[in-house]
Curated annotation (Swiss-Prot):
Organism: Chlorobaculum tepidum (strain ATCC 49652 / DSM 12025 / NBRC 103806 / TLS)
Full protein name: ATP synthase subunit a 1
Gene: atpB1
MF-aspect GO terms: proton-transporting ATP synthase activity, rotational mechanism
InterPro entries (UniProt xref): Alt_ATP_synth_F0_Asu, ATP_syn_F0_a_bact/chloroplast, ATP_synth_F0_asu, ATP_synth_F0_asu_AS, F0_ATP_A_sf
Spans through the membrane: 20-40, 78-98, 108-128, 174-194, 196-216
Taxonomy of the source species: Bacteria, Pseudomonadati, Chlorobiota, Chlorobiia, Chlorobiales
Keywords: ATP synthesis, Cell inner membrane, Cell membrane, CF(0), Hydrogen ion transport, Ion transport, Membrane, Transmembrane, Transmembrane helix, Transport
Its membrane topology: Multi-pass membrane protein
């Protein structure tokens, strides 16, 4: 038994390694890219649209409203990034129904990469909204003495994003293994259902936290 898919090495040459996390991550990206191309290839801008497009527009509208309720004034600017985070995490967790599949979100390297993308995106959005000088001034608010504390806070919340997602996914897997040894017939079915629900919740929480951080960086001063 291994704790993370990082430990499953599929190919190695010197210091170069290809582990299961990398393979599943790229497979998910190809799945999402291919699915997006298939779903959007027949979208219409006319008055008459298909039921499928109508459902997609409802979902996008709901996401748009959710982002605006968090505090972002121009949700359409941030929707692609936030939606990409949610779709990747949600799809990674939903695919656990496939036998033998191990979600990359159970790897700290993947969750750290997702958190790093948020860490980079937040100042970029902030600078785009209020200029470089205006954004940097926020680190000295409300007084300059808060500068080191604000910098540390920026770093620690990024670490918290990565560890929170990794810990929640890892704990779910460990509980499933424990219950499987107790009752191999009943508990696995219930835990798989609960695991799917938990995976969706974790994707939602991660996306909402990213939205909150972006809203804080782009708020009007």
């Amino acid at each position: 038994m291994h704790l993370s898919s990082d430990e499953v090495i599929l190919w190695q040459s010197g210091f170069l390694k290809l582990n299961l996390t990398i393979v599943t991550t790229w497979a998910l990206m190809l799945l999402l890219a291919g699915g997006s191309a298939l779903i959007t290839r027949r979208l219409s801008t006319g008055i008459t649209i298909s039921r499928w497009q109508s459902m997609l527009e409802i979902i996008v509208t709901m996401a748009h409203r959710q982002i605006s309720e968090v505090g972002l004034q121009k949700p359409e600017k941030y929707l692609p990034f936030i939606a990409a985070l949610f779709l990747f995490i949600a799809t990674a967790n939903l695919c656990t129904v496939i036998p033998g599949y191990e979600p990359p979100t159970g790897s700290l390297s993947t969750t750290a990469a997702l958190a790093l993308s948020v860490f980079i995106a937040v100042p970029l959005f902030g600078i785009a909204e209020s200029s470089l000088v205006g954004y940097l001034k926020t680190y000295a608010e409300p007084t300059p003495i808060m500068l080191p504390f604000n910098i540390v806070g920026e770093l620690t919340r990024t670490m918290a994003l990565a560890v929170r997602l990794f810990g929640n996914m890892m704990s779910g897997d460990m509980i499933l293994v424990i219950l499987l040894t107790i009752s191999p017939l009943v508990f696995p079915v219930l835990m798989n259902i609960l695991g799917l629900l938990t995976g969706m919740v974790q994707a939602y929480i991660f996306s909402i936290l990213a939205t909150v951080y972006i809203a804080a960086a782009t708020r009007t001063r």
